[in-house]
Amino acid sequence: MELCGFEVGLERALFLIAGPCVIESEQLALDTAGRLKEMTERLGIPFIYKSSFDKANRTAVESFRGLGMEAGLGILEKVKATLGVPVLTDVHEDTPLQEVAAVVDVLQTPAFLCRQTNFIQNVARQGRPVNIKKGQFLAPWDMKHVVEKARAVGNQQIMVCERGVSFGYNTLVSDMRSLAVMRDTGCPVVFDATHSVQQPGGKGGCSGGQREWVPVLARAAVAAGVAGVFMETHPDPERALSDGPNAWPLGAMEKLLETLSTIDKTVKTDGFLEAEYRLN
C-alpha cells in the first residue's frame, strides 16, 4: 500500500508513526518532529509525525485534553510546512472530519470506537489513509469486519493497529499472534508499542504505564512481522501532559529504532513460515 509517498507492507522497510501523545505547544511539536525526522532519515525509516489536538478518552474530567482543534491543526500544519513530514492525528465522533482531513495526511480512529460503524465509515469517506486501532476488548480476527466497513465506502488505504488487550483490571497484554492474524485483513499491520504498556486508570485519576517494557514488546512485534511501529515519545516523559508513564524518551529513540530496523531487515529477508503452515 502506498502511504504518504512511500510503500508499506511486509515486503517493505519498517515505517514509524511517532510523536507526543498530545500537542502541548508549537515549539515542542517542532523540536520533537525535527529530531525524529533527523534520526529516521539517518536510519532510512519512513516517518509520520503524530500528535493529538484533543484527547477525548481521558480518565478524569480534569485531565489535560489538548489545545483544541483550531490551535492544534495550526501547529500540525506548521510542522508539515516547516519540516516537510506527513502528519497523523486522531479524530472522534464529534470531530469536524472534513476540516481535519484538509490538514493532516493520515486519520486515526481510537481503539474504543472501532465498533462504531457510522464513525468508521464517516472517517473512511474523507479520502485519507486511516489507521484503525483495534479495541482492547476485540479479538484480532474480528478486525476483518471493521476493515470491511471502511472499505465498503470506497477507501482502500486502511491500516490496522494492535495496542494490547485487556487482561483483568488496569492492565493490558500483547498477544503477538494477533499481528499475524490481522494480516488476514489484507491491510498493513502496525504495532503500538507504547499504549501496549499502558495501565488504564492505574493511577486512580489517570493512567499509569510501564515504559521499561516498550523495547521488549517493540522488538517482539517487529520480529513477528509488521509493516510499521507506533510509539509515543516525549523529550521529558515525566513532565508530559498526557500518557507520560508509557511514553518512550526521545533521547533513547534512535538506539531503539536502530535495533528494530536490524530485526526488521532480518525477518523480512527470511520470510514468514507461519503463512505456509497456518491452518484456516
Swiss-Prot record:
Enzyme class: transferase
GO terms of biological process kind: keto-3-deoxy-D-manno-octulosonic acid biosynthetic process
Catalytic activity annotation: D-arabinose 5-phosphate + phosphoenolpyruvate + H2O = 3-deoxy-alpha-D-manno-2-octulosonate-8-phosphate + phosphate
Annotated keywords: Cytoplasm, Lipopolysaccharide biosynthesis, Transferase
GO cellular component labels: cytoplasm
Compartments (UniProt record): Cytoplasm
InterPro entries: Aldolase_TIM, DAHP1/KDSA, KDO8P_synthase
The family this protein is said to belong to: Belongs to the KdsA family.
Full protein name: 2-dehydro-3-deoxyphosphooctonate aldolase
Lineage of the organism: Bacteria, Pseudomonadati, Pseudomonadota, Gammaproteobacteria, Chromatiales
